[in-house]
Every structure is written in C-alpha cells, then in structure tokens.
Amino acid sequence: MFEALYAGLFNGLIYAAVAVGLALIWGITDVINFAHGEFLMLAMYAAYWFFTLGHVDPTLSAPLVAILLGFVGFLTYALIIKRLQKGPPMAIILATFGLGLVLRQLAFIAFTPDYRNLPDTMVSGSVTLAGISIGRPQVVTGLIALLMVIALFILVYRTRWGHALQAVAEDREVAALVGISPDRVNAQVWMLGSAAVGLAGALLTTFFYVFPSVGTVFGLLAFVAVCMGGFGSLPGAFIAGILIGIIEAMTGYFVAPALKTVSVFILFILVLWYRPRGLFGRW
C-alpha cells in the first residue's frame, strides 16, 4: 500500500506542475488554454528528439525545452489570443481547442501514432525510501516539479513582478492606470505557464511513453485539478494535482487499475457539488 501511496504522491507532483501552469494562465489572463495538453506533448517530443538525435538526457534538456515551450506560449498569445480578446469568450475557447486538435494531428502526421520511449537515462533505476522501492525517474521528476512549483509561487506571491500579475488579474483597467501593461503581463504569463508545462513534459519522457495523444489525459487531469482546486488558484491547483495522483494510485491498488480515472472524476463531481468554486475558490 505504501508503495502505491509513494507512487501516487510523486505522480501527483507531476500533475500539480502541469496544472499550476494552466492555473497561472487561467487565473491571470482569464483564458482557458485547451491546448495545454498538446503543449505537454510537444515538450515530450522535443525532449525525445534531443535525446535521440543529440544524445542529451531529458533531465539536462528540460530547461531548453521549457524555453522552447515558453516561445510557443508567446506565439499562441500574440497570434491568436490577443487578436480574439475583444470578441466573445467562446471564440478563444474554440481557438485553443482547435489549436490542440491541429497540434495533435500534425504530430500524428509527422511522428506516426507509434509509442516511443527512451532506453536508459541518467535517472534510470530505482531508489528505496523508508524500505519501499520506487522508480528513480518518478522521484527525480516529482522533486524537480516540486521545486518548479515553489519557484513559481515565489515569483507570483513574493516579487514585484508577481504583484503586477495579481493587479492585472484583479482589475486590468486600474492596473493600466498605474503603469502596468496588461498586454505585456498576459504575454509573460503565457510564456511562463507554457514553460512550466514544457519542463514537466520533458521530465515525463524519462519514464512515460511519447505518442501524439499523450497530452489528452494530462491536459484533462490538469483541467480537473484547476477546477477542483479553485478556478485560477495556484495553491488549489497544486493540492488538487497531488490529490488526484494519490486517488489514482489508491484506486488502482485497492479497487482496479481500470477505474483510476473514474475515481478522479467521481471525486471531481463531489467536490464541485459541495463547493462549486472549488476547494480554494472564492465564495
């Protein structure tokens, strides 16, 4: 049981890292990026090809992949989101959803539907924690994801720049009056949120298969975590992501692996039934 609990905890840290990137974009810019899972897929393919062609381990290429995905996030904002912001909200929803479909289909064409995985990486093997053996890739990825989330929290809640983000999230017009550019902040947030999912995606390749639709499940779970934690709440998304990982692991251990995702959605429905704004949402 404790082995499953540990696995769920470290998987939950990865879910949390992906969810926090989505929550950051949603909370500051008031836009739901339905292509978030496909951004993770791009990051996984980037790390895979860095390893295959350049022999660069994903743990080492992760910062570069994060930068690349940050640029993808900037382009998405500059070319799509910015142009649609003054239109109906449904236009942006459909645009990001359509972008996800396009990216997934392009991946099918370019890389085929084959499942790919990396052989031995620098974090391959297992470690023993309190007498329980667990895969080293999951531990390393989970810990790096935790450090990344802590760094994001410090940036958002403990720096001047973070205060500017919160000001834009609270009231764009007032923020503009005091010299804060909402447009610049939005672009930076899209870059940062996309870089976060890029880092998580690169690290995932150390133990997870890479295929065109890999981002679908992770994107969906990130969306569930953000909604469950409280719309746009970074601490809420973080805690909900960990909770999802643990619930999945415990369901797989005590009930059946096939019901892992079902249990997450049952919990999701119960949380929103009791607290419609999520665990940390404002009433």
Feature-to-residue mapping (PLM):
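Helix-loop-helix "hairpin" substructures at the membrane interface of multi-pass membrane proteins
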Residues: N11, S133-F211, L234-I239
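Structural signal for membrane-spanning alpha-helices in multi-pass inner-membrane proteins
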Residues: A23, G27, A47-T52, L69, ...
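Membrane-interfacial amphipathic/re-entrant helices at transmembrane-helix boundaries
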Residues: M1-V18, A46, D57-S61, G87-I92, ...
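Cytosolic-side transmembrane-helix boundaries in multi-pass membrane proteins
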Residues: A110, D114, E170-L177, S181-R184, ...
